[in-house]
A protein has these predicted regions:
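The feature identifies polytopic integral membrane transport proteins across all domains of life
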Residues: 8-19, 41-49, 109, 141-146, ...
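Structural signature of hydrophobic alpha-helical transmembrane segments
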Residues: 169-181
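Interfacial loop-to-transmembrane junctions
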Residues: 185-212
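C-terminal ends of transmembrane helices
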Residues: 61-68, 134-135, 187-197
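Cytosol/matrix-facing amphipathic helices and coiled-coil assembly/linker segments
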Residues: 1-18, 67-149
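Juxtamembrane boundary at the C-terminal end of a transmembrane helix
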Residues: 215-226
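Generic transmembrane alpha-helix signature in multi-pass membrane proteins
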Residues: 15, 25-37, 158-163, 189-191
């Protein structure tokens, strides 16, 4: 595990590595496909940028909609639980006791735990036991959607900038190599965040990227208008 400042950075960056990888793969696939089709530089650059913008907006919109729905669902569950605690506290205590019995506690201990947790914070105890949610920790749709969009855009910029900045015929090959290195890096970061052996995720991500770019490049060749 990483510690200190590096650990804090990794804690923030780590969860968004998959979105960065998505951005790299999506942008690279679009750029390599148009490069395979032999289009001019201006068309390739515009198509890559349009794909990057569309992908960024789509990722953010999907994440926002998903978390917004999750937040609304959790809010409804908390309201329902609060009403039940006010109108039928004994039944709710019995229900909480049975939940802990089903998880392996003896009936006596389960009852004691249920009583103590209810006395401390009844709503939190029941919400966490019954629904796996916390009243004080709710999803933040806008913040998380922006983070997902930023990660996707950051990843997607790399292959697009490679296509923009590298002149002439080598651009597709050089972009291919740059993307493989970037995906290997995201695979390594994911492995480090999970305390896994680093080689397999690196090879897997690079292999997926190579296959995706090869397929889109060949598809571009096959649909070449000329």
């Amino acid at each position: 595990m990483v510690n200190g400042a590096a650990g804090r950075i990794a804690e923030w960056v780590g969860p968004h590595v998959p979105e960065a990888s998505d951005g790299i793969l999506t942008s690279a696939g679009i750029c390599e496909g148009f490069a395979g089709a032999g289009v001019g530089s201006s068309v390739l650059i515009f198509a890559g940028f349009a794909g990057l913008v569309a992908g960024t907006l789509a990722m953010g919109a999907v994440e926002y909609s998903k978390l917004r729905a999750e937040r609304e669902l959790q809010a409804g569950q908390l309201i329902r639980e609060r009403v039940l605690l006010e109108t039928a506290p004994d039944a709710e205590l019995d229900e909480l006791t049975q939940l802990y019995v089903s998880r392996g506690l003896s009936p006596g201990l389960a009852r004691q735990v249920a009583i103590e947790l209810t006395a401390h914070d009844a709503l939190a105890a029941h919400a966490e036991a019954e629904y796996g949610i916390s009243p004080v920790s709710q999803p933040e749709p806008l913040r998380d959607a922006l983070a997902v969009s930023a990660a996707f855009a950051a990843g997607g910029l790399l292959p697009w900038l490679a296509m923009v900045l590298i002149p002439g015929s080598p651009r597709a090959a050089v972009t291919f190599v740059i993307v493989l290195l970037a995906l290997a890096l995201t695979g390594w970061v994911s492995a480090r965040m999970s305390d896994l052996h680093s080689v397999r995720p690196v090879v897997r991500m690079a292999g997926i990227g190579a296959l995706a770019m090869a397929i889109t490049y060949i598809a571009g060749i096959l649909i070449h208008p000329g």
